[in-house]
Amino acid sequence: MRGFLKVFLRMLILAERLWRRVEAVSRLEEWIRGIFLEAGGSSLKLSQGEGGWITVEADDERLLSSILRLNMRFDPISSMSQPHTAKVVKIGRGRVSYEYPLPDGSTMRKTFHSRDWAVQLGYEGDDFEGFLEALGVVEGMSISTSLNMPSSIQMRIFLDEVLRGLDRIVLIDLTPQEVEEILESGFKGFTAFYETLTPLTHIVYLKLGSSLDKASKRLEALIHSIAPGASYRPLSWRRFSKIDWSEARFEI
């Protein structure tokens, strides 16, 4: 039939899913659709697939993949090859359990010992879980793994966190536009800059001299107003101050 154009949508499984905030799905679709249409795409649909992983159908899969990768530190697209962008699902008894999706939508479940990662990073103390928590390895957060160890990009992020010497706050279940809204609503004064790891996880670096406690209280109020149900975790840099960090320890 003339004048009829059928649009074929191709599906991408993102290495991203909600932690606790259901409303983040619709907000994430708004953000992805906005940047996709701006780049020349025309049709996009977002949903949750098996295991809760975010599924995106778009008329230009390559364009969408490129846009998402350009906006994230971790590769947000599921893949069979290493490294894998994963979600931390449980921490306890010296172990960290995490999950990531495969391109067919199935879920891989794996576990590593906190000690293995901590030692790899040069930590010589006894509180392995506390050390990893200070680096942002917390339940609900995204990590990047290769052969059950930190990937090269994950090592780079860990090193950046230490060398910058700034307190941080990790954000979970917030979209990039919601992070921007929080900054513009009264949090910019605390913020040096922030990084988006995946579509729903971010690291905010506080300005030198900013109070982590005051920043956390202000952030809590803003999240309650702008994105109820989203999570955050304040991370103090002081926990690193007595550790002998050397770039030689990081094989990047």
Regions from the language model: what does each represent?
Residues 76-78, 135:
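Generic marker of residues within folded, mature protein domains
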Residues 94-100:
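Short aromatic-glycine-enriched beta-strand elements
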Residues 69-76, 83:
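DNA polymerase sliding clamps and clamp-related checkpoint/processivity subunits
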